[in-house]
């Protein structure tokens, strides 16, 4: 609740493992951490079409920001080539002094043909939780979405005049959309881990749009569901 947010104790992030650093939100989490925190940040990513993970991340940081962070690689920015869907890739970090995991990795396409979205958005979360549970001190932060509360209950008799807040998760809402369903299931996994003693936070993010300061938007803007909906409305002359 808001009261818990205002009255709760603020804990330091320490050294962070960040997944999803190549995404629009993830790269800004990385930037804000470097600018405002003192610890190291471990970024698990794939090299993609680039020759190395470092080359890929530097390319993205140069695209979004005017500052040069290349001198921080190897000292404050530690790169781990890996995939959150592979539990063995988390084992590469067994001896690293990680205090907090921030999971910003996800397939955010609202419409997909196969079930790979569940492998990333759900199984990837389970792997991160398993790694976090290997140490009592690790905190786990799950980046979720307000879309888990985006529909009315399919059973309005059981949930009359339902009011939604940050504590609401299941009210028999429509979960046929694979993206929404995957993020819902991920939240369930995180909350289950909390009952087992893991320190967790779930942050539900709204629509990601262009940066307020200068209008910069995500490089792969064509995958943004909200923007595609706006374009569809315009193309159908509903505007």
Give, region by region, the residue ranges found by the protein language model.
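Active-site beta-alpha turn of Rossmann-fold NAD(P)-dependent dehydrogenases/reductases
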Residues: 105, 141-144, 194, 206
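Conserved Rossmann-fold NAD(P)-dependent oxidoreductase catalytic core, especially the SDR/UDP-sugar
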Residues: 103, 112, 116-119, 123-178, ...
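A structural motif corresponding to the C-terminal end of an alpha-helix
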Residues: 71-78, 131-137, 186-199
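NAD(P)-dependent short-chain dehydrogenase/reductase
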Residues: 154-163, 191-239
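Flexible loop/turn segments at secondary-structure boundaries
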Residues: 24-25, 49-52, 86-88, 108-112, ...
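N-terminal Rossmann/SDR dinucleotide-binding element
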Residues: 1-100, 104
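C-terminal, well-structured subdomains that either form a transmembrane helix-short loop-helix hairpin
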Residues: 17-22, 26, 114, 120-127, ...
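Phosphate/diphosphate-binding loops
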Residues: 176-190
């Amino acid at each position: 609740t808001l009261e818990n947010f205002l009255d709760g104790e603020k804990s330091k992030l320490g050294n962070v493992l960040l997944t999803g650093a190549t995404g629009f939100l993830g790269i800004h989490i990385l930037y804000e951490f470097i600018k405002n925190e003192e610890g190291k940040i471990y970024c698990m990513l794939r090299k993609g079409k680039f020759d190395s993970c470092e080359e890929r991340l530097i390319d993205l940081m140069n695209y979004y920001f005017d500052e040069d962070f290349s001198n921080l690689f190897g000292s404050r920015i530690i790169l781990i080539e890996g995939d959150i869907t592979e539990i063995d890739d988390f084992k590469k970090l067994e001896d690293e002094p990680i205090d907090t995991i921030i999971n910003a990795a996800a397939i955010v396409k609202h419409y997909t043909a196969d079930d790979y979205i569940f492998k990333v958005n759900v199984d990837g979360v389970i792997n991160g939780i398993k790694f976090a549970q290997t140490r009592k001190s690790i905190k786990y932060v799950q980046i979720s979405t307000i879309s888990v509360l985006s529909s009315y209950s399919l059973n309005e008799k059981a949930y009359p005049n339902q009011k939604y807040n940050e504590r609401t998760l299941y009210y028999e809402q429509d979960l046929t959309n694979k993206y929404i369903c995957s993020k819902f299931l991920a939240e369930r996994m995180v909350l289950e881990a909390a009952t087992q003693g893991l320190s967790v936070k779930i942050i539900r993010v709204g629509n990601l749009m262009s940066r307020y300061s200068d209008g910069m938007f995500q490089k792969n803007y064509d995958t943004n569901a909200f923007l595609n909906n706006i374009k569809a409305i315009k193309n159908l002359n509903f505007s």
